[in-house]
């Protein structure tokens, strides 16, 4: 997977998550699952695991993910990919280690903001449009209510045990990017260096 595809699929889908409109009232059972998901994410200050990313063209990439709230994440892609995605709390950097190139974006412009926030909220600036019960978990479909471009993100959870399994982003062109998490576990004492921006600072793209 090339840098341009990853940048578009993993990060720049954020504008495609925007949809102006009022939040929908959820059924009590659906609201209970949303509350359960929020409580789980709020109680997960740091974690690590592996991920499998499938882009809109069907290309599959794998790697290791580290997350530390608020705002920090690192996606290390397995070889032969030379990609590295790092959020330092404010800025997300998409780097190609082989080409020594990097593009930077504000975290607030990316889907990562939904579960890296200091306070996890799915009722402020986000509209939960659907809660879908699965055999062993549930899915929450959400849209950013501050904007005009159609799109959505689907967060998938297991409920026994409660765990974030991944997310799927659908953009305005109906193209889907899926990130599946494998063996995500709580982590303590993560090296702060994991979340340092790669390569010299460059102007952040807005």
Summary of predicted features, one role per range:
Residues 6-11:
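N-terminal export leaders
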Residues 99-146:
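Flexible, surface-exposed loop/linker segments and immediately adjacent secondary-structure boundaries
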Residues 123-125, 133-206:
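Gly/Pro-enriched, hydrophobic low-complexity segments
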Residues 39-56:
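A short, Trp-centered hydrophobic/proline-enriched beta-strand micro-motif
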Residues 62-114, 177, 183:
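An acidic-aromatic
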Residues 55-57, 98-100, 173:
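Solvent-exposed strand-loop boundary residues in beta-sheet-rich modules
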């Amino acid at each position: 997977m090339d840098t341009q595809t990853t940048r578009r699929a993993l990060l720049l889908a954020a504008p495609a998550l925007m949809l102006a409109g009022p939040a929908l009232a959820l059924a009590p059972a659906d609201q209970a699952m949303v509350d359960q998901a929020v409580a789980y994410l709020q109680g997960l200050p740091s974690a690590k695991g592996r991920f499998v990313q499938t882009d809109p063209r069907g290309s599959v990439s794998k790697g290791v993910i580290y997350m530390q709230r608020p705002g920090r994440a690192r996606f290390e892609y397995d070889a032969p990919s030379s990609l590295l995605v790092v959020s330092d709390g404010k800025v997300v950097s998409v780097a190609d280690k082989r080409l020594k190139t990097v593009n930077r974006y504000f975290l607030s412009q990316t889907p990562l903001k939904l579960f890296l926030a200091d306070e996890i909220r799915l009722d402020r600036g986000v509209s939960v449009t659907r809660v879908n019960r699965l055999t062993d978990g549930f899915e929450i479909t959400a849209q950013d209510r501050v904007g005009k471009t159609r799109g959505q993100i689907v967060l998938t959870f297991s409920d026994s045990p409660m765990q974030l399994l991944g997310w799927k982003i659908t953009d305005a062109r109906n193209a889907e990017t899926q990130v599946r998490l494998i063996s995500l576990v709580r982590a303590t004492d993560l090296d702060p260096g994991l979340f340092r921006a790669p390569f010299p600072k460059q102007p952040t793209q807005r």
